[in-house]
């Protein structure tokens, strides 16, 4: 007989079997569905990455995603994976940044923070920090630091600045376009543009410098050993102050420079390591400041024959510690407007300096002018010192054995002669024309001087207060101080210490007693007497 329905026992058995089947099968079914979704998601991600790569990426020869192009906006990549090792940053003329990041060959887009309209963008993976700002329409400010890496600047007139950075752990470049033409005009201010730059190469071949007026400090402390500036248009430049200060360029050919509008060349080659400087085309007719221009420069010779110095007022430290053993063109210098020559040849390596045409009638300071100079002789016969007030250390350590023209010096306005001939190698000093009536300090004036003969017959020391160490270790055998009035002197300590003098004359017995009073600082063989 046909059975029409399941018994209760049979139903329970069926339900039990189905329950067992569900318990066993459902997880597998769920996993299968999940795997399908993940597979679909992976496919979507792969397609998205491929699309992104096609729009933004550039693969290298090995197929590795190497570089990015067509950057997207900061906000478009925000809140996505922040792991990255490459980035491209662009700035528009308002200072807004657009960024694309790529991480570890995984085609990921990272995130980056954009701060305001003057965007500061930092790419930091422990190796580099990049910060760049474009501010006012005519001024370029920067702060670019790259730790233990290398970067190279290039310029394109249509796209602007480009900087290629190479991390110390990688050879892959990171291309970052910085500020280019601002308001669609060529930059007029290149002041300090490559200051402290660690770029080993600076390509300026496409520079448009036709509107530039300021190149002050442009390559200051730049480590680039070679600079090709032949394409520079400097026709509108007015200041080159410190332009190559501390530059590591080994040679500088500036023969194409138009310097006709330049007024400031102070510190231009300060601490420059360039051993060769081609300045043959320099027009310096408008230059007013040449202070420290070649200080510590490593140029072995200087040809300044083309220099027109008729408007220069400041030559302070111009050749201070210059390595040039020869300086051509000094005899052509027009120095009629120069007011300060302090330290001008201080520690200069030039063994011969022709100052025959120097007009020093406007000079007020000759402080340390020949301090440590390597010139073996000095002819100052043309010097007009009538307005000089400071001759402190003027010949300190000078190796010149002869100094011509001292007998013509007009020192009527000089107030400071301290250390004037300290350690000077001059064997004889004719100071018979010296008017020292306004001098207040003569401390160390002849300390360690090698002059065996010193004519002090015209010295008026009535206003001098300091004679400390004045003749210490002086080689002069006779000290005729019979013109000296020491009534206002407050310090005579060590005045004759280790002096080689054996004969001394004083104006009055009171002066003689003062000179003889110190037995500790006066040689035992030197006794001062009143000159009859």
Model-derived regions, located:
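Negatively charged
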Residues: 124-532
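Membrane-proximal N-terminal amphipathic helix
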Residues: 34-62
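Short, well-structured alpha-helical interface segments that form or flank functional binding sites
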Residues: 3, 13, 43, 185, ...
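Periplasmic/extracellular, small/polar-rich flexible segments of pilin-like filament-forming proteins
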Residues: 54-132
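N-terminal single-pass transmembrane signal-anchor helix
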Residues: 2-29
């Amino acid at each position: 007989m046909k059975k029409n329905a399941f018994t209760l026992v049979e139903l329970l058995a069926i339900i039990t079997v189905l329950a067992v089947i569900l318990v066993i099968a459902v997880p597998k079914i769920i996993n299968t569905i999940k795997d399908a979704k993940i597979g679909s998601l992976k496919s979507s991600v792969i397609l998205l990455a491929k699309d992104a790569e096609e729009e933004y990426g550039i693969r290298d020869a090995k197929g590795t995603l190497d570089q990015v192009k067509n950057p997207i906006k900061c906000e478009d990549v925000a809140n996505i994976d922040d792991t990255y090792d490459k980035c491209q940053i662009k700035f528009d003329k308002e200072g807004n940044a657009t960024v694309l990041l790529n991480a570890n060959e995984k085609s990921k887009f990272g995130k980056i923070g954009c701060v305001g309209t003057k965007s500061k963008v930092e790419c930091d993976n422990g190796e580099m920090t990049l910060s760049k700002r474009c501010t006012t329409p005519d001024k370029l400010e920067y702060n670019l630091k790259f730790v233990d890496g290398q970067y190279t600047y290039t310029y394109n007139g249509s796209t602007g600045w480009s900087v290629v950075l190479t991390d110390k752990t990688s050879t892959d470049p990171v291309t970052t376009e910085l500020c280019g033409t601002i308001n669609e005009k060529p930059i007029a201010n290149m002041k300090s543009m490559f200051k402290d730059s660690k770029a080993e190469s600076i390509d300026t071949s496409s520079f448009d410098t036709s509107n530039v007026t300021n190149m002050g400090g442009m390559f200051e402390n730049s480590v680039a050993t070679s600079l090709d500036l032949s394409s520079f248009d400097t026709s509108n430049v007015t200041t080159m102050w410190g332009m190559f200060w501390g530059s590591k360029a080994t040679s500088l050919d500036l023969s194409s420079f138009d310097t006709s509008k330049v007024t400031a060349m102070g510190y231009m080659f300060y601490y420059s390591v360039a051993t060769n400087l081609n300045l043959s085309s320099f027009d310096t007719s408008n230059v007013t400041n040449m202070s420290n221009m070649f200080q510590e420069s490593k140029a072995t010779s200087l040809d300044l024959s083309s220099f027109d110095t008729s408007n220069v007022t400041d030559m302070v430290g111009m050749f201070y510690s210059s390595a040039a053993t020869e300086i051509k063109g000094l005899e052509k210098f027009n120095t009629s407007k120069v007011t300060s020559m302090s330290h001008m040849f201080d520690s200069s390596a030039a063994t011969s300096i022709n100052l025959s045409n120097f007009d020093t009638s406007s000079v007020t300071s000759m402080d340390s002018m020949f301090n440590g100079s390597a010139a073996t002789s000095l002819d100052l016969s043309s010097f007009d010192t009538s307005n000089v007030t400071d001759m402190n250390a003027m010949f300190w350590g000078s190796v010149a054995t002869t100094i011509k023209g001292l007998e013509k010096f007009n020192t009527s306005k000089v107030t400071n002669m301290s250390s004037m001939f300290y350690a000077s190698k001059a064997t004889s000093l004719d100071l018979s024309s010296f008017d020292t009536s306004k001098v207040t300090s003569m401390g160390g004036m002849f300390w360690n001087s090698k002059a065996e003969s010193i004519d002090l017959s015209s010295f008026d020391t009535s206003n001098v207060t300091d004679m400390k160490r004045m003749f210490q270790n002086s080689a002069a055998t006779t000290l005729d101080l019979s013109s000296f009035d020491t009534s206002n002197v407050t310090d005579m300590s060590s005045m004759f210490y280790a002096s080689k003098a054996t004969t001394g004359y004083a104006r009055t017995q009171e002066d003689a007693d003062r000179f003889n009073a110190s037995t500790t600082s006066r040689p035992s063989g030197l006794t001062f007497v009143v000159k009859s």
